[in-house]
């Protein structure tokens, strides 16, 4: 392992990370091209010496800081020692890494080192964005002679608190191999470049929210007073103020090719909004959060539809989840359902205040349309067919609404330390005979979607103003890595 042996500043560390990463990526691409064109195998001795490896970032603390900050949710050491991780795409993560390093460098006097690791970059992750042209017949040979993805080396043990103490402590929740794995999946599922993702995320489970988001987004990028400068759409479409007929340029066929298409309303400072249509079901919700978490978003909110479970609710009312009954089952092995998922005060307050502001219902009046309570998330699309069992469970939990995604998203936020929240809109009341019918559904959608989406956007504006205060200490484990 190469060691420069000098204490780097955060800026120097980032420059060195980018330098080492680019060296490895270029070497791997050149070796692949030489193999494809000439059949030349990579030099095994050069590989042993780190020809294709990720750079590693290490931060050491001697425990001498007299008064380490206790109120921050990140940028803290739990004990003296050396913390390390491997890094991929340092240019993409530069702002994030710089923020984290500056905190420990200035507050703790931490020692920062950058060197080459022993973990090789899998070849599939360097092909995109290069001039390499490969066909399927080459796959077996490349897998045999070049580093490739090994699932045994990829996991969420650190995020789940399952890592085994050793010589080094983990510096971050995700190492380079885990990050690269998810970056590739994000592009595949959403149809957009990972560079376009914004830190404030809205999830929805209905395409009509997408239509409204696109309409509003296009109006924003034409407004000279708006901070939004572009709209990145699933299928590789990029809309700016110069785009003629922007809504017509966004093809339905483009996003329909992707399982969970995304749209990114971009700001010049990278503090915009991403909307992901996750479709229906907890499996999709888990999948997108597994991969989106590596980008370390500032918040994700579920803005979708639900079934109202209380007689006093009306179609079009809102539900602000403050607790979850997790009948989704997709996370039971890593986060048992008896583990409580706490609500995040800052997020709850933002969603509540945004609902008051957008609906125009001040003070106590907003409670006529906004119900706070427990949301059930189920993995059974036809839960109504087991009415006797379902009704008893709903009654015991005091649930006010049911859907198929919200608890999964909240649980994933809890796992990955991403602030989370849920504001749902009642689209039917199956326990009280008000079920979805085609004509009723259309009238409901037309009246509710615009306001509901605007509440989500307004909540993001409020949360953006919170800055680092948005991140909650209640999501920290006992041995939390220093980086957010």
Describe the role of every protein-language-model region.
Residues 1-299, 307-484:
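Accessory terminal and edge-of-domain segments that mediate assembly/interaction
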């Amino acid at each position: 392992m190469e060691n420069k042996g000098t204490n780097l500043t955060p800026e120097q560390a980032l420059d060195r990370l980018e330098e080492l990463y680019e060296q490895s990526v270029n070497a791997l691409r050149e070796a692949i091209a030489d193999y494809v064109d000439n059949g030349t195998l990579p030099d095994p001795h050069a590989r042993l010496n780190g020809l294709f490896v990720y750079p590693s970032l290490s931060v050491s603390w001697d425990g001498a800081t007299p008064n380490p900050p206790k109120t921050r949710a990140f940028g803290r050491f739990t004990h003296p020692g050396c913390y390390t991780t491997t890094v991929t795409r340092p240019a993409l993560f530069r702002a994030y890494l710089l923020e984290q390093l500056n905190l420990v460098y200035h507050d703790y006097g931490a020692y920062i080192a950058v060197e080459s690791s022993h973990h090789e970059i899998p070849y599939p992750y360097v092909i995109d964005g290069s001039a390499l042209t490969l066909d399927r017949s080459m796959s077996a040979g490349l897998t045999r002679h070049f580093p490739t993805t090994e699932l045994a080396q990829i996991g969420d043990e650190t995020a789940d608190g399952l890592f085994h103490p050793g010589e080094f402590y983990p510096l971050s929740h995700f190492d380079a191999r885990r990050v690269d794995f998810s970056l590739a999946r994000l592009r595949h599922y959403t149809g957009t470049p990972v560079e376009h993702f914004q830190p404030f995320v809205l999830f929805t489970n209905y395409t009509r929210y997408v239509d409204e988001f696109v309409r509003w987004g296009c109006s924003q990028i034409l407004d000279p007073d708006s901070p939004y400068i572009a709209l990145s759409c699933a299928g590789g479409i990029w809309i700016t103020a110069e785009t003629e007929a922007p809504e017509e340029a966004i093809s339905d066929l483009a996003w329909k090719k992707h399982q969970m298409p995304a749209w990114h309303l971009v700001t010049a400072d990278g503090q915009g909004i991403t909307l992901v249509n996750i479709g229906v079901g907890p499996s999709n919700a888990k999948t997108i959060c597994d991969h989106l978490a590596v980008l370390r978003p500032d918040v994700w909110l579920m803005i979708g539809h639900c079934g109202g479970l209380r007689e006093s609710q009306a179609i079009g009312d809102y539900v602000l989840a403050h607790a979850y009954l997790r009948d989704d089952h997709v996370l039971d092995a890593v986060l048992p359902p008896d583990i409580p998922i706490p609500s995040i005060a800052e997020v709850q307050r933002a969603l509540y205040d945004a609902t008051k502001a957008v609906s125009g219902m001040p003070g106590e009046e907003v409670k006529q349309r906004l119900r706070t309570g427990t949301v059930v998330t189920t993995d059974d699309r036809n839960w109504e067919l087991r009415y006797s069992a379902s009704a008893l469970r709903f009654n015991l939990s005091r649930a006010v609404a049911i859907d198929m995604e919200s608890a999964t998203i909240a649980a994933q936020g809890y796992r990955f330390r991403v602030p989370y929240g849920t504001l749902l809109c009642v689209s039917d009341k199956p326990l009280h005979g008000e079920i979805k019918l085609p004509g009723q559904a259309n009238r409901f959608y037309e009246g509710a979607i615009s306001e509901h989406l605007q509440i989500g956007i307004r909540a993001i504006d409020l949360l953006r103003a919170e800055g680092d205060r948005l991140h909650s200490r209640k999501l920290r484990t006992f041995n939390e890595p220093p980086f957010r």
